[in-house]
Design a protein with these regions (language model features):
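C-terminal catalytic "cap/lid" subdomain
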Residues: 1-144
Length: 144
């Protein structure tokens, strides 16, 4: 896997991003526009719906836990969870940009509404490569 530093370019959804997606190029982006209670998590969930694809979220922990593992040593890893149960956990966190939860509440609602299979992984790119190549990976799966 050859990963290079991206060039940052401002392009609009209608004139640029849709065309890149149609060409099957990988697109990494933050929020596509300002929307209340939405972060780049929400944008990514909406893109997964638009592309009819799974949603893979890389974050600073290895998956979903019952509480913040960076604060609590007793945090329990959750390897699999339903959309409904995940949404309940997400809604316990008060929304704010930069919040410390694996997905924001708007993204959680989107993946539940559209039944998007979602993977929560840490920032180890070898682990991501394992998932993409259908090998054993460390992370959490959210699905029905």
């Amino acid at each position: 896997m050859d990963l290079k530093s991206p060039n940052t370019t401002r392009i609009s959804w209608n004139t640029g991003i849709k065309n890149l997606l149609r060409k099957n190029l990988v697109v990494f982006c933050g929020a596509l526009r300002y929307a209340e209670k939405q972060t780049s998590d929400s944008t990514a969930a909406k893109l997964a719906h638009y592309l009819n694809s799974p949603f893979i979220n890389l974050t600073n922990v290895s998956g979903l836990y019952d509480k913040n593992p960076k604060k609590y040593r007793s945090a329990k890893f959750i390897p699999e969870i339903s959309h409904e149960d995940f949404l309940k956990i997400a809604n316990k966190t008060k929304f704010h940009p930069g919040q410390h939860f694996v997905l924001d509440q708007t993204a959680a609602k989107t993946i539940e509404k559209y039944n998007i299979k979602t993977y929560i992984l840490g920032d180890n790119l070898k682990n991501l490569d394992n998932l993409l190549n259908e090998r054993h990976f460390v992370g959490s799966v959210i699905e029905w």
